[in-house]
Regions:
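Extracytoplasmic beta-rich repeat domains
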Residues: 1-3, 12-32, 57-79, 103-120
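Structural signature of WD-repeat beta-propellers
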Residues: 1-3, 32, 39-40, 80, ...
Length: 136
């Protein structure tokens, strides 16, 4: 396998600020100071946006039973200081955006390949069987 990287460029002159090797196919979430992403092996990672240094890394899949850990995060979204991640095998994992620690896990049931969305204060998940789950 090949390792992928995340890069930061100076938009004024096009020079590379930093790069960090992270094996991830998910699109990161970027806020004022942080870059949040999930590695392909289930680690929730927070990178300092200015320096590129890893602030923390938490294996969120280890909260699942051993036989359910062989999955991947298929998408995630941030809302109210929380990260909501969906897994291919049908779990919703809620993490703190401050510490990365898992705060809640919910089994949805169906395969999930799309990222969750937030609208009007509610979280929505679309499964591969075209079922929509909504949470307040």
């Amino acid at each position: 396998t090949t390792m992928s990287s995340i890069f930061s460029f100076n938009l004024q002159n096009g020079l590379l600020n930093w790069n960090e090797n992270v094996d991830s196919t998910n699109t990161p979430i970027i806020d004022l100071n942080n870059i949040f992403l999930f590695s392909d092996n289930g680690f929730f990672i927070n990178i300092d946006k200015k320096t590129g240094k890893m602030i923390w890394s938490v294996n969120v899949l280890k909260i699942l039973k051993k036989k359910k850990q062989n999955t991947k995060v298929t998408g995630f979204i941030m809302g109210s200081g929380k990260i909501y991640a969906t897994t291919l095998n049908g779990y919703l994992i809620q993490c703190s955006a401050v510490s990365g620690l898992v705060e809640n896990v919910r089994k949805i049931g169906d395969l999930i390949t799309a990222a969750p969305i937030i609208s009007d204060g509610a979280l929505y998940i679309l499964t591969d069987k075209s079922r929509i789950f909504g949470f307040n």
